[in-house]
Regions:
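Canonical RING-type zinc finger of E3 ubiquitin-protein ligases
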Residues: 559-568
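Cys/His-rich, Zn2+-coordinating zinc-finger modules
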Residues: 528-550, 557, 572-615
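Short loop/turn motifs at secondary-structure junctions and domain boundaries
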Residues: 261, 556-558
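Intrinsically disordered, low-complexity proline-rich regions
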Residues: 488, 567-568, 605
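Cytosolic C-terminal regulatory domains/tails of membrane transporters and channels
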Residues: 401-530
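Short, positively charged
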Residues: 36-37, 249-250, 462-463, 540-547
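Transmembrane helical cores of multi-pass secondary ion antiporters/exchangers
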Residues: 1-411, 415-418, 482, 486-489, ...
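Beta-sheet entry/capping signal
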Residues: 107, 565, 572-573
Length: 615
């Protein structure tokens, strides 16, 4: 285990340094390592993968997946994770049946084995090269559900191999029962675990319950022959969505850190283990009576069929229904290059290798099926892993704009601050010191203003200057506390509490520093909420600025400003809320002109004071 984790850490660090996909590098390293003398034979057994690795992997992904985004993309996710898996099962099964001397049921089982893509590799590339977020959401949503579809389909094919008498109706019935049972158990586990965690006050106990949750959902579902994988996903989606209501803030931070670490180690260990299987897979082929040319042809044909079917299905299901004018008007088609990238992101992973070992020992040419599953897994990882970054760059897919993110973040903070100040007004009873109330108001507004500051200008805004100086102060404060600790005159528990508080403050400053260093390459023109705001629809054309040299009031007063805003009604130039004068907001209060726009170079966003939305 120590050697495995060490190799994973070294491999991911090397991949990051070389600018390549970590899963791809780890698979190659595993293939080479399988032939190194002294390396033990680590078999990927079904129990190890399906019970030991898959539940925590899926749960870690599910709790960080937005349930709202998942619902918003239900149609494409369902078409990929359910329909495409079935289409691939049938298509690949027919190809294998045509090439290999095996029964149709066994060939369909092979189709189910290679049907589910593994989005870990694709999304790791997606985040590295900057794919649009909707593509990443669809790929992650597909990976959460397609394993369940493939395993249920495989179970049905195995039943047809061993018992016979399986009909289309029985397959459909088994699938529906398995899905419904999994959803019921997943919802029940989410409700039960949520009820318990809401009443647990100790963070360590709360996070420990979280670590058990994947198996609390998986094992009962499998016991009643439902999909344990789908039960884990449902429980994870619901608990992640309700985390703000059932957990304390410190528990949420601790849980995110723990699951991020677990997910990182498991995801990358899996790809190293995949590579380590190559030697045993090739050794087992010596037992087959098929010609190596037939095996090679079958591997290539199944790989090509797997890739081609995804292309055909994704394009057909995306643009076929939109040939109907009513459908096209209600749901316009996405750009073709979005569809092309999703079609090309069909890498296979550990579920394919684990599923092939679920085939009974008496399956005809089982060792050949294992080799084909490995060939499809390794082939898609190598082919897509090497070419997907190039394809994304070649198709000029727009990456997420950090300044667009800052704009949306600032809008949310502004609305949150507004809600918090309203609550403050209702909570006050008149006995509070004025300096306490003013400090609360200032702190609430400063958080939103700090994000607004990062939206433009070349000079360092006050929040960045504060973070830089405060981090330097914290460094000296920590050195002094460590000096006191070396003297041994203060209790270690007291000193550790002080050091922990310094760590918490510095971690917040580090997050702010990372956000402030993000750069954009295009002008900031957000989609915003213009469609829902009458004022933003009205004030579109910019008037002539009255004082293009700077804030009108600051120029009169001889004071300075941070960033500039322009009134879209009269052309008044005022300073932002981070500036001492806050003249832009004062102009709105005095004139009730609702819309202003940024007057910073390269920015075209607007803000409605009345409705608190951007456009």
């Amino acid at each position: 285990m120590v050697v495995l984790v060490t190799c994973v850490l070294a491999g991911t660090a090397l991949a990051r340094r070389l600018g390549m996909s970590a899963p791809l590098l780890l698979v190659v390293a595993g293939c080479l390592g399988s032939y190194v003398p002294g390396i033990p034979d680590v078999a990927l057994t079904p129990d190890l993968v399906l019970v030991g690795l898959l539940p925590p992997l899926l749960y870690a992904a599910a709790i960080r997946t937005s349930l709202i985004d998942f619902r918003r993309n239900t149609r494409p996710i369902a078409l990929l994770s359910v329909s495409l898996v079935i289409v691939t099962t049938v298509g690949v099964g027919l190809v294998a049946w045509w090439i290999l001397p095996v029964p149709l049921a066994a060939a369909l089982a092979l189709g189910a084995v290679v049907a589910p893509p593994d989005a870990v590799a694709a999304t790791s590339i997606a985040r590295r090269v900057g794919m649009p977020r909707r593509i990443v959401t669809i790929l992650e949503g597909e990976s959460l559900v397609n394993d369940a579809t493939a395993l249920v389909t495989l179970r049905t094919a195995i039943a047809a191999m061993t018992a016979g008498g399986i009909t289309v109706w029985s397959i459909g019935f088994d699938f529906i029962v398995s899905a419904i049972g999994a959803v019921v158990i997943g919802v029940a586990v989410a409700i039960g675990v949520g009820y318990v965690r809401r009443r647990v006050k100790d963070d360590l106990t709360d996070v420990s319950i979280s670590l058990l949750t994947p198996w609390i959902a998986y094992l009962p579902a499998e016991e009643i022959h439902a999909s344990g994988v789908l039960a884990v996903v449902v429980a994870g989606l619901l608990l992640g969505h309700k985390a703000q209501l059932i957990q304390s803030a410190s528990s949420r931070v601790l849980e995110r850190t723990n699951w991020a670490t677990i997910g990182f180690l498991l995801e990358n260990s899996v790809f190293l283990l995949i590579g380590l299987q190559i030697r045993s897979v090739l050794d087992d082929l010596r037992e087959t009576d098929l010609a190596y040319s037939t095996i090679g042809w079958a591997c290539v044909a199944v790989l090509v069929a797997t890739i081609s079917l995804r292309f055909v299905w994704v394009f057909a299901s995306t643009y076929g229904p939109r040939l109907i004018p009513a459908v096209r008007r209600a749901d316009p088609a996405p750009p073709w290059h979005y569809t092309a990238v999703i079609s090309w992101a069909g890498m296979r992973g550990v579920v394919t290798l684990a599923a092939v070992f679920l085939l009974p020992g008496d399956t005809p040419h089982r060792e050949v099926f294992v080799a084909i599953a490995f060939a499809v897994t390794a082939g898609t990882l190598l082919l897509h892993g090497l070419s997907l970054p190039w394809a994304v760059r070649r198709l000029n897919l727009p990456p997420p704009d950090p300044h667009e993110d800052h704009l949306q973040e600032a809008t949310v903070y502004q609305k949150a601050a507004r809600a918090g100040l309203k609550r403050l007004d209702t909570e006050m009873n008149g006995d509070e010191p004025e300096e306490v109330i003013e400090r609360l108001r200032r702190r609430s507004l400063d958080r939103a203003n700090a994000v607004w500051e990062r939206l433009g200008g070349t000079a360092e805004p006050p929040s960045v200057q504060y973070a830089k100086l405060r981090r330097s102060m914290l460094e000296s404060e920590r050195e002094e506390v460590l000096r006191i600790r070396r003297n041994g005159h203060i209790d270690q528990g007291v000193l550790q509490h002080v050091l922990d508080s310094l760590d918490v403050e510095e971690s917040v400053l580090e997050r702010s520093a990372q956000d402030s260093t993000a750069e954009r390459e295009v002008d900031l023109v957000p989609s915003g909420d213009r469609g829902r705001c009458a004022d933003l629809r009205t004030y579109v054309d910019a008037p002539r600025p009255r004082t293009p040299e700077g804030c009108e009031q600051c120029l009169d007063d001889g004071t300075s400003w941070v960033h500039l805003r322009m009134c879209m009604a009269c052309g008044y130039i005022g300073c932002c809320d981070s500036s001492p004068g806050q003249h832009s907001a004062a102009h709105w209060h005095g004139t009730e002109h609702p819309v202003m726009r940024s007057f910073e170079p390269g920015e075209a966003w607007r803000w409605c004071f009345t409705h608190q939305v951007t456009g």
